[in-house]
Amino acid sequence: MSALRRKLGDEYQVVSTSASGGGLPPPRAAPRGKRQRFVDKNGRCNVQHGNLGGETSRYLSDLFTTLVDLKWRWNLFIFVLTYTVAWLFMASMWWVIAYMRGDLNKAHDDSYTPCVANVYNFPSAFLFFIETEATIGYGYRYITDKCPEGIILFLFQSILGSIVDAFLIGCMFIKMSQPKKRAETLMFSEHAAISMRDGKLTLMFRVGNLRNSHMVSAQIRCKLLKSRQTPEGEFLPLDQLELDVGFSTGADQLFLVSPLTICHVIDAKSPFYDLSQRTMQTEQFEIVVILEGIVETTGMTCQARTSYTEDEVLWGHRFFPVISLEEGFFKVDYSQFHATFEVPTPPYSVKEQEEMLLMSSPLIAPAVSNSKERNNSVECLDGLDEVGIKLPSKLQKITGRDDFPKKLLRISSTTSEKAYSMGDLPMKLQRISSVPGNSEEKLVSKATKMMSDPMSQSVADLPPKLQKLSGGGRMEGNLPPKLRKMNSDRFT
């Protein structure tokens, strides 16, 4: 622990450990009422189907699946009851044959041949059926060739016994081999955490495999269950949204040999785009995690589920490391599987962080739509001049217009994400700027209109001196070599 603290720093503190306790409890919001979960922590879905009406007959049409889905106590009850009824029914049939033939009468001489030897009451008929069905064959009771009805009943008994054995034993085998118990050795962390990873706000939780046998083709999916109302007024109580845990990159395909931390990057496409530490205290949602894979030993598909409600998501936490390198192998400490520690995390949502970054960056200015926003843009650009962001002296010489209004140049630069110099402005706009009496608002309106026009101008729009210099093209031939290179780079 001390070595880990030296590695991570003293500012990190363990705030949550395994279910056995230890460590400081994670911070909790104000106590709420009991939260109704859609999926329990053990993966059981809290859904009950009612008012089926006549649809219950569909369960009998798929009787085998119905028996497999029953609880164990009902399976055992049906198993014992079916065999008991079958045995009593077949024993009664043998007793009826013996009664109708008169084999139960003991007054027969030695020359009389019964249907079944040594069957003279119901218990003896029941024992004969058990010996035949279980192929015990003691040899004391046996069927004779003088009883054709006994031969037919024997064939019927063999067919019926095979059907009952195949149905009930197969049902019990399928139920015992179901991979539900394999899912109990797949662990999920008790809490999910939200913190920064690789410079991005990320939702994280941990999964682990307690067995040495692998989960083949393990894949994980996440669903966000949240109630919402559509613009048409329809209320959706359990709207399901997909959480991206690496579908495009293949990160959802797991090699689950050691505990893994599953990450969902919160971005503009995430349902948690506007989720902050403050709004999470009032939100109500449930994150359902589904882990699927093929059991290596049986080849059957296994699915493990769990869920995290809003009060089980810790803001500003990170999971404790559980893997250490020993001599020749890696050791996993599952006592720290659920442990988290606090890390510095901004309490704002990703949307709020992007808005603050946009407002704080002077190079990203919105389009000028009204006088208030225009004045704010001009003031922002005035601040840039104060910190020393000016045009290079060579580019100032290119413009050759010292009397051009600086505010107009700034405002025109806000109409596009690309900053233009004086030389990039159209010649009509340059002539307008030199006319006295033009107010700033008129210049702004004309500048906006001119900047929306194509930047390419004809030679007729140039002054006569520039027409002569340009020779029907650009003035690149009269520029110094360095400025000619700069100008060519700008237009490419």
Curated annotation (Swiss-Prot):
Gene3D superfamilies cross-referenced by the UniProt entry: 1.10.287.70, G protein-activated inward rectifier potassium channel 1
Keywords: Ion channel, Ion transport, Membrane, Potassium, Potassium transport, Transmembrane, Transmembrane helix, Transport, Voltage-gated channel
A GO MF term: phosphatidylinositol-4,5-bisphosphate binding
InterPro entries xref list: Ig_E-set (IPR014756), IRK_C (IPR041647), K_chnl_inward-rec_Kir (IPR016449), K_chnl_inward-rec_Kir3.1 (IPR003274), K_chnl_inward-rec_Kir_cyto (IPR013518), Kir_TM (IPR040445)
One of the protein's GO biological processes: regulation of monoatomic ion transmembrane transport
Membrane topology note: Multi-pass membrane protein
Location(s) in or outside the cell: Membrane
Chain location of the short sequence motif Selectivity filter per the record: 135-140
Name by which UniProt lists this protein: G protein-activated inward rectifier potassium channel 1
Organism: Gallus gallus (Chicken)
